[in-house]
From Swiss-Prot:
Comp. bias intervals (Low complexity): 381-393
Keyword Membrane: no
Main location: cytoplasm
Region (Disordered): 374-393
Pfam family membership, one: Maelstrom
A GO molecular-function descriptor: transcription cis-regulatory region binding
Protein name: Protein maelstrom 2
Domain of life of the source: Eukaryota
General function of this protein: Involved both in the piRNA and miRNA metabolic processes. As a component of the meiotic nuage, plays a central role during oogenesis by repressing transposable elements and preventing their mobilization, which is essential for the germline integrity. Repression of transposable elements is mediated via the piRNA metabolic process, which mediates the repression of transposable elements during meiosis by forming complexes composed of piRNAs and Piwi proteins and governs the repression of transposons.
DNA-binding stretch(es), residue numbering of this chain: 2-69
InterPro entries, per database record: HMG_box_dom_sf, Maelstrom, Protein_maelstrom
Length: 468
């Protein structure tokens, strides 16, 4: 039931009871009967404040107080943000699936171009999702051509958020190690940089509908600050045509890897029952090409921070896609396009007759395509295949169970007699250790030596000289 409305008369009754000493001792019914005659004699102007107070009380009753969580945040607002985030994730997945499925239906999946992007940042605002960019890179990739082009630049934002210099210095020293403003390197005009990025994307995605945004892909944990960095650059644009950064849509590259792997296996006619998002994420996060030399920018190559370089990131992602799916599409990989131009092999050759097979979690590039057995080269046997090769081995085992000896004969095992003497010596030492001095002194005065324990006299007597 809806709450009862307040009346001006009851507002007057409550005020009369609070201000009149006589009314404090009366009940509600008695106060109503006493105030009824007074209320009838009041004019409309005198009743006005009480009627307006009743209306205000009705409004306050309808307005409920918002519940807060343990962090002091409005619970309804938090739930709204969670719903928006979930809807955004679903929208990103649907867009990725639509792109891959359209390419598959047109039988042109291996020639479809994808753009991988990455940002480095100096610092993040405490209360908002504003990130100050430090470096940007993008790469154009397709299965058939590999890496087709790379765009990379350092960014000088001019200044960082006030009061966050220490945080920016710590983040920089532990990651990309880029100098902070005002000593930062790279492009200083944010609007010009944003226009250059849009021009680069427009050349890649020719024939795109002008009303639709450019689609780029980045790592899952990078999606929030990549979107924020694009908005940061768009706000500095002078013409104001891309003020909100809506011209670029950022999607999840790890979900793209999962969808592409399933569709590639379907094209190849291979079962994809064992492929799920956890498997593809584990493969992507292994980052087989993390320490590949000469694929980062000059600054990070000289400062030995190529792992955090955005240019190295977008190229390593492209190598991972080629490494994971080019073999399923029967596409021959080319150094510098699908795989790094320089790589130090870190593997051993397993013969073709071995039962050791390549694991599905291993890199396809890290194992040679063919292994030919040479006659003059030594064969490396695995533990699983060594049992089968024993029949052809020249080794003849020897039976060591044919020797039989009598353990009671000292001439066959002379060391056993020495062991008995050693045991007697140990017992004698333990005896002297436990006995008091008064009992041990007569033994030494009688000329008893340790040799007597090893060679006992023919007369069987105990240690005290008594006959046994």
């Amino acid at each position: 039931m809806p709450p009862k409305k307040h009346s001006g008369f009851m507002m007057f009754v409550n005020e009369w009871r609070d201000n009149n000493p006589e009314g404090r001792n009366l009940s509600i019914a008695q106060a109503v009967s006493r105030c009824g005659s007074i209320w009838e004699k009041m004019t409309a102007q005198q009743r006005g404040p009480y009627n307006s107070g009743a209306k205000n009380a009705d409004v306050l009753t309808r307005v409920k107080k918002e519940r807060l969580n343990c962090h002091g945040q409005v619970l309804s607002q938090v739930e709204l943000e969670e719903r928006e985030m979930a809807e955004s994730q679903i929208h990103m997945k649907r867009c990725t699936e639509r792109i891959v499925m359209d390419a598959k239906r047109s039988h042109d999946l291996e020639n479809t171009k994808f753009v991988f992007v990455a940002f480095n940042y100096f610092t993040k605002a405490f209360t908002t999702d504003v990130y100050v960019p430090a470096e940007f890179s993008a790469s154009e990739y397709s299965f058939n051509e590999g890496i087709m082009s790379v765009y990379s630049t350092l960014i000088d934002p001019g200044q960082i958020i006030f009061g966050q210099g220490s945080d920016a210095q710590h983040h920089s020293s532990t990651t990309h190690n880029l100098p902070l403003p005002p000593n930062a390197l790279g492009e200083k005009n944010m609007g010009k940089l944003y226009r250059n990025i849009l021009e680069y994307l427009s050349k890649i995605q020719e024939g795109k509908d002008a009303t639709k945004p450019f689609v780029v892909f980045t790592k899952t944990d990078m999606v929030p600050f990549v979107k924020s960095c694009f908005r940061y650059l768009a706000c500095e644009n002078q013409d104001g045509s891309y003020e909100n950064g809506d011209q670029i849509q950022v999607l999840d590259i790890q979900y793209l890897l999962f969808i592409q792997k399933k569709e590639v296996l379907d094209i190849a006619g291979v079962s994809d029952e064992k492929i799920n998002l956890y498997v593809t994420d584990a493969y992507f996060l292994k980052d087989f090409f993390e320490f590949t030399p000469e694929i980062s920018c000059q600054y990070h190559e000289e400062n030995d921070r190529s792992k955090y370089c955005t240019q190295s990131l977008v190229m390593r992602w492209a190598y991972t896609f080629s490494d994971y799916m080019c073999s399923d599409l029967a596409i021959s990989v080319q150094p510098g396009k699908h795989i790094p131009p320089k790589t130090k092999p870190n593997y051993r050759v397993i013969p073709a007759n071995s039962s050791v097979h390549e694991s599905s979690f291993d890199s396809f590039y890290s194992i040679p395509a063919s292994c030919e057995k040479k006659e003059d080269s030594p064969t490396v046997l695995s533990p699983a295949s060594s049992r089968r090769s024993l029949a052809s081995s020249p080794y003849v085992p020897t039976d060591h169970t044919s020797f039989v000896g009598d353990l009671n004969k000292k001439d066959e095992f002379p060391s056993l007699d020495q062991r008995n003497k050693l045991a007697a010596l140990i017992d004698l030492i333990q005896f002297f250790y436990r006995c008091p001095v008064q009992l041990c002194r007569p033994l030494f005065s009688a000329g008893y030596h340790l040799n007597d324990a090893l060679e006992p006299p023919h007369d069987p007597r105990d240690l005290y000289g008594r006959p046994l």
